[in-house]
Amino acid sequence: MNNLSYLTKIPLIWVLLSVTLLSACSVAPPENFIPVQVDDVSNAQAWEMQGKLAVRTSKDKFSTNLYWFHTDKKNELTLTTMLGTTVLSLTTLEGEARLEVDGKVYQDKDAQRLLTRVTGWSIPVDALPLWITGRLSDDDELLVQDEQQRPMKLATQNPPPWEVEFISWQQQSGAELPRLLQLKREDLRLKIQISHWQALSAAHLLPSNQPEERLNEQ
């Protein structure tokens, strides 16, 4: 069963061409985190990103707005329609996963298992924070690098494998990270366009001379 089939469907080409900001109702980061600049994504204590997610299967295709807040202990993933209506919210915190979709709440110890069970999607939510920032996990095999030693293609070792292509790169929040990724697994295709990525620091750890940078002012 796919509880997300009612999401607004648009051709995938609009995902690639869209460069506009998300709607004004975008989710704000927690108040105890402050935007900062970093010289490498690995130096970010936490981050948030906004962009687009396009999904294509053998039977269907659609796209949504994507918001992600990430720390070492917590993830908040939100999908919204093009009108800004939240249709899916996934939160993980220290071994607990909570999924809210279609007005119902589901819980599990494993976020990947929960998302697959409820939506029918096998989206790699555990690995995506690394891939979004252009990094590999210990279980990933690097297949191709570009001239700047950045990953161009990787494959996961767990069957059936995911194949990830890093199509283009960009500078955000002082660091270099992917702009467009494509993920393939059997008949499932995902494209993620990162429109905005912001490094965050816990407010009580921020040096007094650290300049603030708000995401909605970029």
Swiss-Prot record:
Subcellular location: Cell outer membrane
Main location: membrane
Keyword Manganese: no
Keyword Transmembrane: no
Membrane topology field: Lipid-anchor
Alphabetized UniProt keyword annotations: Cell outer membrane, Chaperone, Lipoprotein, Membrane, Palmitate, Protein transport, Signal, Transport
Lipid-linked residues (N-palmitoyl cysteine): C25
Lipidation (S-diacylglycerol cysteine): C25
Gene3D superfamilies assigned: Lipoprotein localisation LolA/LolB/LppX
Signal sequence, start to end: 1-24
One GO biological process term: lipoprotein localization to outer membrane
UniProt-listed NCBIfam families: lolB
Protein function: Plays a critical role in the incorporation of lipoproteins in the outer membrane after they are released by the LolA protein.
Oligomeric and partner information: Monomer.
Entry similarity comment: Belongs to the LolB family.
Protein name as annotated: Outer-membrane lipoprotein LolB
Gene: lolB
